[in-house]
Amino acid sequence: NRAELQGKLGVFWHTQGSGKSFSMVFFARKVRRKISGNFTFLIITDREDLDDQIHKNFVKTEVIGQKEECQPKNGKQLRDYLQTNKSFIFTLIHKFRYDKGKKYPVLSTRDDIIVLVDEAHRTQYKDLAENMRTALPNANYIAFTGTPLLGSKRLTNQWFGNYVSEYNFAQSVEAGSTAPLFYSRRV
């Protein structure tokens, strides 16, 4: 039940190089196939190369069309896309930048917006993330990360909820997907 989760869909913790961007594709496809509704998937990254990589994976898997306009060029275009109920939007967290000292405006009160945040441990604890949550107060959020913030604060879990999938470095080495890493001090 989405209401009980308070917009926290969870943390998808898979080690680097394990295919998190394809997991985003599978997640979006499954939601569209299994749950009725007119969902908007907002895919957030913090680097242009990641934004392009994830967008290309959605194109290659034919979830979206090659020429579909879904990567806003600036904050204004992002706001326009959100208000026109596009199915998929790929953008940088930086497009939620706003004048210092001013409150970010609400862009949509829809509860069928699902925000997929790539590398959530890097961007989700400061002003830009707070602006995004102010802009989309009823959205549902899921984190994709290879490095969740752990320890006593467990910030990633506080912002996104419990783990929905875990595949850590040790599991990847054991499965043969990752070569083990050894360090030898020589100084």
Describe each PLM feature range.
Residues 1-187:
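RecA-like P-loop NTPase motor core of helicase/translocase proteins
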